[in-house]
């Protein structure tokens, strides 16, 4: 397909949002995604939580998209890992003010990954002229790559990966045995980006090919991924022995964190287990 044909698949934008609205959508997206994590644990929200962020960066410059992504990531991590303040003050014996500063710095660094996601996404659309039908796939791959990078870069910080939000969703979490948490993250982002793409197509005036022209690829892949998830879960749920199911539980040793790493209590700690 030539350059003219590629550009033709990306009709003119219809969303001219004021900056305060974009900021509100970005921050709201971060807060919405945090609802999928403890203590709320509404995992289903993760399937739509990124849509406001995708809407916010639509039509933005790469630089503006980066700041919107940063703002979204900052709101998400502040709402998700705020509890580390208690850990730092109680067990690290840090002053409260210093704990707050440390939390802000930590969340600021982590938000950089979300900023990189939105920056690279818009950069790819602007410079590479990605067809809109490819954008959801690019978003899923880019997000997953950045999560993997965050797991190992600078000693790694694999907390609050998007896929972890499905730990209470038995159908989805079983997929982790095949593709890991990163595969679940990719599935969630693919669904979010596909739904956002459908929203843009619905808002755009109809063209000769219809609103949904070019959406078959991401929609088809998203449906296929969801169907494969359900099918894989049903296979794992099958009882191959025909015996009665058993329930397995895990119990923590309830070791006081102030004593956990004290060598003087090492033997007593092991005895508890």
Spans of features found by a protein language model:
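Soluble catalytic regions of membrane-associated enzymes that act on cell-envelope
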Residues: 233-273
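Membrane-embedded alpha-helical bundles of multi-pass enzymes
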Residues: 2-237, 270-271
């Amino acid at each position: 397909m030539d350059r003219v044909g590629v550009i033709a698949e990306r009709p003119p934008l219809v969303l001219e949002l004021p900056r305060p609205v974009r900021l509100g959508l970005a921050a709201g997206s971060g807060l919405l995604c945090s609802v999928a994590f403890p203590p709320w644990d509404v995992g289903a929200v993760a399937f739509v939580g990124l849509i406001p962020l995708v809407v916010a960066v639509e039509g933005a410059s790469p630089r503006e998209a980066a700041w919107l992504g940063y703002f979204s990531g900052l709101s998400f991590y502040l709402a998700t890992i705020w509890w580390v303040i208690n850990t730092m003050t109680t067990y690290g014996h840090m002053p409260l003010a210093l704990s707050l500063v440390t939390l802000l710095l930590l969340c600021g660094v982590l938000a950089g990954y979300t900023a990189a996601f939105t920056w690279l996404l818009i950069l790819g659309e602007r410079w590479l002229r990605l067809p809109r039908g490819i954008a959801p796939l690019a978003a899923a791959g880019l997000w997953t790559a950045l999560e993997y990078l965050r797991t190992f870069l600078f000693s790694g910080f694999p907390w609050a990966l998007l896929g972890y939000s499905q730990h209470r969703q038995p159908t989805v979490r079983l997929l982790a045995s095949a593709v890991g948490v990163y595969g679940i993250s990719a599935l969630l982002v693919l669904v979010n980006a596909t739904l956002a793409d459908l929203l843009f197509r619905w808002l755009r005036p109809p063209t000769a090919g219809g609103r949904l022209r070019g959406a078959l690829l991401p929609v088809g892949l998203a449906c296929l991924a969801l169907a494969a998830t359900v099918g894989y879960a049903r296979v794992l749920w099958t009882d191959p022995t025909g015996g009665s199911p058993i329930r397995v539980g895990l119990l923590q040793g309830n070791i006081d964190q102030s004593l956990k790493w004290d060598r003087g209590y090492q033997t007593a700690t092991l005895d508890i287990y």
